[in-house]
Amino acid sequence: MTCRVGLTEWRLAPSGAAAIRLAAAVGADGIQLDFGGPGRGVLVDGPGRAGQLRAVADEAGVDLLALAGNLLNDIGLTSQPAVVQPVLARLADTATELGVPLLIVPSFRRSAITDAMSFTRTAAALRWAVSLAEARGIVLASENVLPPARARQLVEEVGSPAFRLLLDTFNPVRYGLDPAWLATELRPWWADQIHLKDGPPDTGPSPLLGAGQGGVRRTLTALRGSPAPVRALVLENDYRDGHGARLRADLEWARRAAVNARESEKGKLT
């Protein structure tokens, strides 16, 4: 099966329909959309908006790969259920309306997992949310920077075949973890889409893929032979400065990596 190359809406200068059209213009196969919210753009669950975005994507020939609930980093996934559950329900409903296969729930800033209490609350929130996702035929993925033992515990406590972990090729580095090590240790539980970046820095003009300190090549090599093949390599370097040359260079790098992923998968089948 083809390994696609995609973009993340929240790391581009334009948003919404314009971001989808940009993805088509630069030759990306797909795009992950952000749900929006204060300081994050127009909410995708506004009247008619999801349908409009889906129509634009169909017309442009761009796959809608995932929906990310980045506003949870502002609200806090560890907030009381009365606060977080309505947001998770809106995310699941919107993901269904968009027709995406993956819903991303991040655990950074106010959603960071920093102690036993935040871990317990995160597991409870994800367990509640994954029941909604599973009923809709959607995979729910947690993006976090837990070490392997705690990440495995999270998978066990959520306890659903519709739950996965989302691998980022640089975020763990900022927390003293090696993404290639994580890729190997947590191999059975990764979602089939991966965020590619190779900082530092995490924001602003970041190193081109393969030229930074993240060791993105080692991480992708470590994923070879995973039970679940990688279906999408998604760029998450910061392109909000509108520097098209960097975006195109990273797309070309990712395209070569996607070809390698396909060849690796063929090797498993022969």
Swiss-Prot record:
Catalytic residues in the record: 143, 236
GO molecular function, one term: isomerase activity
EC number(s) given by UniProt: 5.1.3.35
A Pfam family of this chain: AP_endonuc_2
Keyword terms of this UniProt record: Isomerase
InterPro entries membership: IolE/XylAMocC-like (IPR050312), Xyl_isomerase-like_sf (IPR036237), Xyl_isomerase-like_TIM-brl (IPR013022)
Catalysed reactions, as listed in the record: 2-epi-5-epi-valiolone 7-phosphate = 5-epi-valiolone 7-phosphate
Primary role: Involved in the biosynthesis of the alpha-glucosidase inhibitor acarbose. Catalyzes the 2-epimerisation of 2-epi-5-epivaliolone 7-phosphate to yield 5-epi-valiolone 7-phosphate.
Protein family (similarity comment): Belongs to the hyi family.
Protein name: 2-epi-5-epi-valiolone 7-phosphate 2-epimerase
Species per Swiss-Prot/TrEMBL record: Actinoplanes sp. (strain ATCC 31044 / CBS 674.73 / SE50/110)
